[in-house]
From Swiss-Prot:
A motif (Nuclear localization signal) lies at residues 359-364. The modification (3S)-3-hydroxyasparagine is found at N676. A lipid is attached at C60 (S-(15-deoxy-Delta12,14-prostaglandin J2-9-yl)cysteine). This is Nuclear factor NF-kappa-B p105 subunit. Generation of the NF-kappa-B p50 (Nuclear factor NF-kappa-B p50 subunit) transcription factor takes place both cotranslationally and post-translationally via non-mutually exclusive mechanisms. A cotranslational processing allows the production of both p50 and p105 (Nuclear factor NF-kappa-B p105 subunit) from a single NFKB1 mRNA. While translation occurs, the particular unfolded structure after the GRR repeat region acts as a substrate for the proteasome, promoting degradation of the C-terminus. It comes from the Eukaryota. GO terms for cellular component: chromatin; cytoplasm; cytosol; I-kappaB/NF-kappaB complex; NF-kappaB p50/p65 complex; nucleus; protein-containing complex; transcription regulator complex. ANK repeats lie at residues 540-570, 579-608, 612-641, 648-677, 682-711, 716-745, 769-799. It comes from Rattus norvegicus (Rat). CDD domains: Death_NFkB1_p105, IPT_NFkappaB, RHD-n_NFkB1.
Length: 973
């Protein structure tokens, strides 16, 4: 506020020497102070006051219990502040005044009380022999905020009358008063005005929680009066023990001590008492070259709970491409004095870029064609052939080949049929060959399928022909008795023949499928005979349908869905892998819109959630896949899922805002998502999140299209305007104020602690008001906006609106055109034209105007619209009558000579009787990469000229609010 300094020039009093220096530029000590030589007398502080642990007391609390202790004071050894006049022996007078702790010291409004104290000043005599002066019973009286200006003005007046450092502590132009000594004198009107202005200015900046002691010694002159002033000395700062910024900073607990290098992860931190607008969370790392990296946690005053808990988001690490964890430190830091807490360790770990493990699965070794064949001879061919691991027709010594192990079907004498390797070259999925094992996730209706006669042995005895594929162990034959051996040989022979017949039937079935494929070229001929194997899962729990989607084989997905349609389809299309991902989840994650449509067509279930509780709507909104989200929202089951929270308590609309996806947000709003739904952690709505992320595009979309409740509250009563004010966002504060936000709504956070209340007398004890957006205003611009001052942004050359030729249309032509656009036909009215002209996002605002078509034309003119584009839009609508009206205007000379109507002449009905549109057309987010229609559409609003005129003003709010500020602003926000 230095620009408002009334002492910046001498014009106020029309004197050449008056007020030539600002009080902000006053030096700590005046250059005309005498007796400031190395050999002469000087004042020295022997014992500094104790900086922390002493409480400032209010008048109603009575005197302090014990005086201000010295810095070295201990429980059993008390000490107090002391000064000494050096190089001098004789009578002297020492005064003590309270001064501020800023760079430039000024008188403080608090008062010293105790023995030898009067009017807030302590006066003690020294000498004639002992030149050490102690102050054993000093107390500090805390003035209330309401009386700061009054007390400070009286204190400055007293200092000027007595000559107690007025040039140093009041204003440099009053330095000459010290020469008059301590005698009473009358102040001139000019001097009184200087004092009043100085008191007013210093009141705004005064910190009531900290003071310093200024010691000044006066030596007697030739007349015996104490007028010879020694150079004053100033003590260390003394902090009120009840003030938040007086306590020692300390981190008590954090719920996390590690986070990703990309930052943005939420952490809950418990601490000793802090001041919500004077605290930072600092991350730092000391580098080997001596440098220091630092980053600061992201939070606003609304994220500080009762001065003891902070919820913040971690900063991004200096290098997001690290390959191993990096150790840093985190600490609390006070903004005002840069005091820090003891640092705590924090670990940054590398970014997990493949949280869904899609890339990992894609990078696995792809199967080679040669891997499907063994190295031996015959049908078995060494481990990869049709009949398992045998090396040739009768081989029995080969080891099991790779691929899926097929169950034995109750034949213990034979190894499982080893199929060729799958896409992952794994042996998992169907359980490996063990006695009487079953399929993993085997379909319940598999026995009813066409393969039942192959998979189940017949009741009748089957005689096998040809040699047995497997032989009994010779070791067993040697040990068993002869009769037992014969019986066993018969059983084995029976089982050999039975198994061989079934294996040959299976081979014939696959051979026929291969012939059919050769004739038709349709891969579904091969897939059909293996359709029951689609339920097999690999070591990650993925089925063939999961893998086909992961590897982007869209046509294969369609083929699999076709051959498995029917009784086993539901089990396959909704099967989850080990990450609880269904094929539909993976199709959304891999951005395959066509596959999503195919899965939905065959009945994929939208309601299934992944391991984090995310539905497919959450996943699409998180990745910003608006096309896929649109496909999902068309499903009949989407309406039941659209407001479902995930494991973090976030709805899809919350995630769309957090992902900065305007298109997804618009789709969700249009589909009926609950705009005012609260996330389940703290009760924030989508509008709270948009303000928290400083995203005016999304905030405008929620207000204009979603009709969001502008004064919606969190669990602690915080509104979006609280957040905007606390973060100092002028644009969002102006937008919310224009939408009708109430700057006087109190949240549940006490404005102050009852013990620290500014004034107990005259107030109802125990009743503490909540905090309003006005109380939280981080700067004067936000404060003024909340008090009704119009928002005035600084425009750059890029902000200049384009110029069109719509103004060439005469008033009569525009009125005729507007009349044609007011017809109820949905294909030819103003709403359809707005969509064609790119202004459809403002249709909700247009409807609130008494003449929507006229408002539309005014907006189109402001946006730089052209007649050519207007005619083309009308042509697309097939509105020949409207086109003829425009063409006729240019055929009539009299009409073209008419003066065009201006936007300021247009009659616009206000949406609210008091709150203005507040330059919504100026609220462009120059840093945004997407356009909500709020950046460009707010530019296109024709409200800007009406804002500067005398006509009615447009606003977004529905409830009238009128707030103002009477008188000058005093005090610090």
């Amino acid at each position: 506020m230095a620009d408002d300094d009334p002492f910046g020039t001498g014009q106020m009093f029309h004197l050449n020497t008056a007020l030539t220096h600002s009080i902000f530029n006053a030096e700590l000590y005046s250059t005309d102070i005498p007796l400031s030589t190395a050999d002469g007398p000087y004042l020295q502080i022997l014992e500094q006051p104790k900086q922390r642990g002493f409480r400032f007391r209010y008048v109603c609390e009575g005197p302090s219990h014990g005086g201000l202790p010295g810095a070295s004071s201990e429980k059993n050894k008390k000490s107090y502040p002391q000064v000494k006049i050096c190089n001098y022996v004789g009578p002297a007078k020492v005064i003590v005044q309270l001064v501020t702790n800023g760079k430039n010291i000024h008188l403080h409004a608090h008062s010293l009380v105790g023995k030898h104290c009067e009017d807030g000043i302590c006066t003690v005599t020294a000498g004639p022999k002992d030149m050490v002066v102690g102050f054993a019973n000093l107390g500090i009286l805390h003035v209330t905020k309401k009386k700061v200006f009054e007390t400070l003005e009286a204190r400055m007046t007293e200092a000027c009358i007595r000559g107690y450092n007025p040039g140093l502590l009041v204003h440099s132009d009053l330095a000459y008063l010290q020469a008059e000594g301590g005698g009473d004198r009358q102040l001139t009107d000019r001097e009184k005005e200087i004092i009043r202005q100085a008191a007013l200015q210093q009141t705004k900046e005064m910190d009531l929680s900290v003071v310093r002691l200024m010691f000044t010694a006066f030596l007697p002159d030739s007349t015996g009066s104490f007028t010879r002033r020694l150079e004053p000395v100033v003590s260390d700062a003394i902090y009120d023990s009840k003030a938040p910024n007086a306590s020692n900073l300390k981190i008590v607990r954090m719920d996390r001590t590690a986070g990703c290098v990309t930052g943005g992860e939420e952490i809950y931190l418990l601490c000793d008492k802090v001041q919500k607008d004077d605290i930072q969370i600092r991350f730092y790392e000391e580098e080997e070259n001596g440098g220091v990296w630092e980053g600061f946690g992201d939070f606003s005053p609304t994220d500080v709970h009762r001065q003891f808990a902070i919820v913040f988001k971690t900063p991004k690490y200096k290098d997001v491409n690290i390959t191993k964890p990096a150790s840093v430190f985190v600490q609390l830091r006070r903004k005002s004095d840069l005091e820090t807490s003891e640092p705590k360790p924090f670990l940054y770990y590398p970014e997990i870029k493949d949280k869904e493990e899609v890339q990992r699965k894609r990078q696995k070794l792809m199967p080679n064609f040669s891997d499907s064949f063994g190295g031996g001879s015959g049908a078995g061919a060494g481990g990869g052939g049709m009949f398992g691991s045998g090396g040739g027709g009768g081989g029995s010594t080969g080891s099991p080949g790779p691929g899926y192990g097929f169950p034995h079907y109750g034949f213990p004498a034979y190894g499982g049929i080893a199929f060729h390797p799958g896409a992952t070259k794994s042996n998992t999925g169907i359980t490996h060959g063990t006695i009487n094992t079953k399929f993993k996730n085997e379909p319940r209706d598999c026995a009813k399928s066409d393969d039942r006669e192959i998979l189940n042995p017949p009741e009748k005895e089957t005689q096998g022909e040809g040699p047995s594929l497997f032989m009994a162990s010779t070791k067993t034959e040697a040990i068993a008795p002869a009769s037992t051996m014969e019986d066993k040989e018969e059983d084995v022979g029976f089982q050999d023949n039975l198994f061989l017949e079934k294996a040959l039937q299976l081979a014939k079935r696959h051979a026929n499928a291969l012939f059919d494929y050769a004739v038709t070229g349709d891969v579904k001929m091969l897939l059909a005979v293996q359709r029951h194997l689609t339920a097999v899962q690999d070591e990650n729990g993925d089925s063939v349908l999961h893998l086909a989607i992961i590897h982007l084989h869209a046509q294969l997905v369609r083929d699999l869905l076709e051959v498995t349609s029917g009784s086993i389809s539901d089990d396959i299309i909704n099967m989850r892998n080990d990450l609880y991902q269904t094929p539909l989840h993976l199709a959304v994650i891999t951005k395959q819109e066509d596959v999503v449509e195919d899965l939905l067509r065959v009945g994929a279930d939208l309601s299934l959630l992944d391991r984090w509780g995310n539905s497919v709507l959450h996943l699409a909104a998180k990745e910003g896949h608006d096309k896929i989200l649109g496909v999902l929202l068309k499903n009949s089951k989407a309406a039941l899922l659209i407001n479902h929270p995930n494991g973090e308590g976030l709805n899809a609309i919350h995630i769309a805002v957090m992902s900065n996806s305007l298109s997804c947000l618009q789709l969700l709003v249009a589909a009926g998502a609950e705009v005012n739904a609260q996330e389940q952690k703290s009760g924030r709505t989508a509008l709270h999140l948009a303000v928290e992320y400083d995203n005016i595009s999304l905030a405008g979309c929620l207000l204009l299209e979603g009709d969001a409740l502008v004064d919606s509250t969190t669990y602690d009563g915080t509104t979006p305007l609280h957040i905007a004010a606390g973060r100092g966002s002028t644009r969002l504060a102006a937008l919310l104020k224009a939408a009708g936000a109430d700057p006087l709504v109190e949240n549940f956070e006490p404005l102050y602690d009852l013990d620290d209340s500014w004034e107990k007398a005259g107030e109802d004890e125990g009743v503490v008001p909540g905090t309003t957006p006005l109380d939280m205003a981080a700067n004067w611009q936000v404060f003024d906006i909340l008090n009704g001052k119009p928002y005035e942004p600084v425009f750059t050359s890029d902000d200049i609106l384009p110029q069109g030729d719509i103004k060439q249309l005469t008033e009569d032509t525009r009125l005729q055109l507007c009349k044609l656009l007011e017809i109820p036909d949905p294909d030819k009215n103003w709403a359809t034209l707005a969509q064609k002209l790119g202004l459809g996002i403002l249709n909700n605002a247009f409807r609130l105007s008494p003449a929507p078509s006229k408002t539309l034309m005014d907006n189109y003119e402001v946006s730089g619209g052209t007649i050519k584009e207007l005619v083309e839009a009308l042509r697309q609508m097939g509105y020949t009558e409207a086109i003829e009206v425009i063409q006729a205007a240019f055929r009539t000379p009299e009409t073209t000579a008419s003066s065009p109507v201006t936007t300021a002449q247009a009659h616009l009905l206000p949406l609210s009787s008091s709150s203005t549109r507040q330059h919504i057309d100026e609220l462009r987010d120059n840093d945004s990469v997407c356009d909500s229609g709020v950046e460009t559409s707010f530019r296109k609003l024709s409200f800007s000229e009406s804002l500067t005129g005398d006509g009615p003003l447009l606003s977004l709010n529905k409830m009238p609010h009128n707030y103002g500020q009477d008188g000058p602003i005093e005090g610090k926000i």
